[in-house]
C-alpha cells in the first residue's frame, strides 16, 4: 500500500479500545483487513460506509487481480500496467491502462475505459448497464467481437460499416465481427451507453 487518504482514526472516546468489524479486523491501521493464504492475498476495506478513503496499492504486474466494490461505496477503480487476468465487479467507473488481460469487467452506473498494450489469448467480457465503454486495442489485433447494446450505439475506426467522421456507427443492435481473421472472443455489452472501439499502436 503505497499511499492512502482518509479518516482512519477512531473517535477520542474509543481511546484504548480497538474497532470491531463484521467479517474481519483492521490489522493494517488503515481501515483494511489484509490476509495471506498461500499465494493469495486478500485486502478488504473494513471502514463503515459513513467513512471514505482512497488507497493506492502496488502489486507485481503478473498478479491475477480480482476486485469487488459494493454499491454502497462511491469508489472508482483504476488499474495500470497489469499483464495477467483482471476481474472487476463494481457499481462505479472502471479505468484500465496498459493492460493485456484477459478481462472480466462489469459495472452498473459507471463508464469503463480500457487501453490494451497487448492482446490476451483468452476471452474478454466487458459489461456496463448505464455507463459507456471505451476500448483502445492494437490495430493488428486478431479477435472475434460480439457487440451488444439496447439503447446505445457502436463507434469504431476499425472497418465495420459505413464511415461517419472517421468513425463507424451501428445503433441499438447486436454485431458479430471477425477482426484480422478472428481470435479470442470479445463480448462487449451495454444497455443504455455507447461503445467506442479505437485503434491503438
Segments from the language model and where they lie:
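A contiguous pocket-lining binding segment that forms or flanks enzyme active sites
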Residues: 124-125
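Extracellular beta-strand scaffolds
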Residues: 64-65, 72-77, 83-85, 93-95, ...
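Acidic (Asp/Glu) and glycine-rich low-complexity loops/linkers
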Residues: 1-72, 78-89, 104, 141-149, ...
